[in-house]
């Protein structure tokens, strides 16, 4: 199964492509789609839509996983990010892909094993899990991370993450989508 991960952003959107064969994950590609911050919003959204569509056509994934929007302190930023995410989802659906959504917490638990991991920890673990020669950019690492989350059964992580405080008290944690103790 080939998975396209997306970390949406209005200026920079990360993408990452993985192949899953059984329990093995193989890196295919990653990068960023950049929009010119000087152009108007509709033009930036079109750049994002076109870029996502092109990535999907180039790498022919079976499905896509995208990071959910978090509510920011600044409501205007949250609305803009939501519009970028919408453009990305439309680009994916336009290519006939099923789209799965994951929170930043689910991504971090799947990749690092800790929901409050910082960007550098996510980059480091993505590099190690995929045997990359160097750290990917933060946007590409998050995109690869959301693809890893989906590949490792991310749909069950939401349920396990909600149990995190109780599991920690019992000395257990979620690691790469599995409960360990």
Curated annotation (Swiss-Prot):
UniProt key word Lipid metabolism: no
Cofactor(s) the record lists: Mg(2+)
Domain of life: Bacteria
Name of the molecule in the record: Crossover junction endodeoxyribonuclease RuvC
Organism: Cupriavidus pinatubonensis (strain JMP 134 / LMG 1197)
Annotated S-S bridges: none
Name of the gene this protein is made from: ruvC
InterPro entries: RNaseH-like_sf (IPR012337), RNaseH_sf (IPR036397), X-over_junc_endoDNase_Mg_BS (IPR020563), X-over_junc_endoDNase_RuvC (IPR002176)
Entry's EC annotation: 3.1.21.10
């Amino acid at each position: 199964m080939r998975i396209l991960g997306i970390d949406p952003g209005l200026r920079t959107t990360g993408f990452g492509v993985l192949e899953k064969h059984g329990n093995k994950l193989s890196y295919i590609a990653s990068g960023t789609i950049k929009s010119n911050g000087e152009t108007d919003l509709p033009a930036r959204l079109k750049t994002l839509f076109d870029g996502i569509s092109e990535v999907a056509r180039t790498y022919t994934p079976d499905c896509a996983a995208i990071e959910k929007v978090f509510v920011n302190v600044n409501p205007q930023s949250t609305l803009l990010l939501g519009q970028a995410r919408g453009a990305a989802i439309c680009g994916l659906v336009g290519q006939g892909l099923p789209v799965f959504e994951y929170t930043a917490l689910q991504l971090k638990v799947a990749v690092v094993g800790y929901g409050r991991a910082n960007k550098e920890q996510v980059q480091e673990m993505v590099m190690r899990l995929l045997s990359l020669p160097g750290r990917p950019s933060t946007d590409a690492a998050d995109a690869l991370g959301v693809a890893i989350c989906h590949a490792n059964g991310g749909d069950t992580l939401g349920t396990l993450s909600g149990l995190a405080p109780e599991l920690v008290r019992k000395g257990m944690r979620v690691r790469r989508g599995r409960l360990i103790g």
